[in-house]
Swiss-Prot record:
Homodimer. Its EC number is 3.2.2.9. GO terms for molecular function: adenosylhomocysteine nucleosidase activity; methylthioadenosine nucleosidase activity. This is 5'-methylthioadenosine/S-adenosylhomocysteine nucleosidase. It is an enzyme of class 3 (hydrolase). InterPro entries: MTA_SAH_Nsdase, Nucleoside_phosphorylase_d, Nucleoside_phosphorylase_sf. Belongs to the PNP/UDP phosphorylase family. MtnN subfamily. GO terms for cellular component: cytosol. Pathway: Amino-acid biosynthesis; L-methionine biosynthesis via salvage pathway; S-methyl-5-thio-alpha-D-ribose 1-phosphate from S-methyl-5'-thioadenosine (hydrolase route): step 1/2. The lineage of its organism: Bacteria, Pseudomonadati, Pseudomonadota, Gammaproteobacteria, Enterobacterales. It comes from Escherichia fergusonii (strain ATCC 35469 / DSM 13698 / CCUG 18766 / IAM 14443 / JCM 21226 / LMG 7866 / NBRC 102419 / NCTC 12128 / CDC 0568-73). Keywords: Amino-acid biosynthesis, Hydrolase, Methionine biosynthesis.
Length: 232
């Protein structure tokens, strides 16, 4: 099995990259992909850059050139579910765009023409992720993760997301674009991220302060998940 892993930022990939054995680096289209073995399992780790376009381009390159069997999206996210705090884990059962609006033509808010309203994560990957969470006794929430090209740091933008997606558990900037690409290429995916901030007017301060905490927790989860997927 070959597992694709995608993180947007240096801080979100560095702990995993440092553990890859026989590591090789491939740079293409402005993104970096690190290949090798993570605890004996073949992995391809992509540092995509921030935002939907970067994430979609990177995911496409990863799938086209390295042919992963599954893709895990890792990193940080802003918490929307009331029970979440910094360092907690979110697992996607679905991903949607929070900044797409073609409702004038009869589509659901967040839905793009020719696409489903949401992109469903793989049930087996969700179950494996939740088993890993239980092993580490971490607080976690499974549900809808929404994505857009904005860092949510104000009451107006937050209220809009909560109005349009009251069931959303977390918000970030890449997951749905990755899910969209995986859907088109028929590659199973799951999003496993750690909370770096609660999406409010102080979220930029929390993000800077707690990104390292989120990166450590999400990397731990991904490493455990890779082992579980490879060895059961």
């Amino acid at each position: 099995m070959k597992i694709g892993i995608i993180g947007a930022m240096e801080e979100e990939v560095t702990l995993l990259r440092d553990k890859i054995e026989n590591r090789q680096t491939c740079t293409m289209g402005g993104v970096e992909i690190y290949t090798g073995q993570l605890n004996g399992t073949e992995v391809a780790l992509l540092k995509s850059g921030i935002g939907k376009v970067a994430a979609a381009m990177g995911a496409t390159l990863l799938i086209d050139h390295f042919k992963p069997d599954v893709i895990i999206n890792t990193g940080s996210a802003g918490g929307l579910a009331p029970t979440l705090k910094v360092g907690d884990i979110v697992v996607s059962d679905e991903a949607r765009y929070h900044d797409a609006d073609v409702t004038a033509f009869g589509y659901e808010y967040g839905q793009l023409p020719g696409c489903p309203a949401g992109f469903k994560a793989d049930d087996k990957l969700i179950a494996a992720a939740e088993a890993c969470i239980a092993e580490h006794n971490l607080n976690a929430v499974r549900g809808l993760i929404v994505s857009g090209d904005a860092f949510i740091n104000g009451s107006v933008s937050l209220a809009k997301i909560r109005h349009n997606f009251p069931q959303a558990i977390a918000v970030e900037m890449e997951a749905t674009a990755i899910a969209h690409v995986c859907h088109n290429f028929k590659v199973p995916f799951v999003v496993v991220r750690a909370i770096s901030d609660v999406a409010d007017q102080q979220s930029h301060i929390s993000f800077d302060e707690f990104l390292a905490v989120a990166a450590k927790q999400s990397s731990l989860m991904v490493e455990t998940l890779v082992q579980k997927l490879a060895h059961g």
